[in-house]
Design a protein with these regions (language model features):
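Active-site-proximal loop/helix segments of hydrolase catalytic cores
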Residues: 19, 25-27, 116-135, 141, ...
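Active-site-proximal segments of metal-dependent phosphoesterases and phosphodiesterases across multiple
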Residues: 40, 45, 112-113, 135-163
Length: 163
């Protein structure tokens, strides 16, 4: 692999679902670290401060964080949680351009169980997903933008043979 920073490239490292166990993982080198949600376990402001401190120790030039369905504090105390994130760019239905690459982050997911950042399918969630620009190079969400249940189904045919 060429060294990081050569050939006008950006090496992006994406992690998610660390659930406050971020200090226990090895993060590969890169230019940009994306944490795509479920950063927290219990989801307290102290957990956010610890996440921020950890992010500050990583060598990546740029960092982006979005919330996920376990990251309640970003929904219940959003201003306080965001204030604690000084070592990253927190995206919530917003975007940023880094080195000419456009990123857009959204924490919203179709409702399943009773988690944070959930909206019912259809108009409710579309209210959050429709504003996503058509031109981000990298959309970042905690779950797929197009739920798997909307994928076309492939009809399979079983065959048996006598041996």
């Amino acid at each position: 692999m060429p060294p990081i920073g050569t050939f006008n490239t950006m090496r992006i490292v994406c992690i998610s679902d660390t659930h406050s166990m971020h200090r226990q993982i090895e993060v590969p080198e890169g230019d940009l670290l994306i944490h795509a949600g479920d950063c927290l376990g219990a989801g307290t402001l102290d957990d956010v401060a610890d996440l921020n401190d950890w992010l500050g120790t990583l060598p990546h030039r740029h960092k982006i964080v979005i919330a996920g369905n376990h990251d309640w504090v970003f929904q219940e105390a959003p201003d306080h949680a965001r204030e604690l994130l000084t070592n990253t760019n927190y995206l919530e239905d917003s975007g940023i351009e880094i080195e000419g690459v456009r990123f857009w982050g959204s924490p919203w997911s179709p409702t399943f169980m009773d988690w944070a950042f959930m909206q019912d399918r259809g108009d409710a969630i579309d209210r959050y997903w429709q504003p996503i620009p058509q031109d981000p190079n990298v959309p970042i969400t905690h779950l797929p933008l197009k739920p798997l249940s909307r994928r076309p189904r492939i009809k399979r045919q079983r065959t048996t043979s006598a041996a």
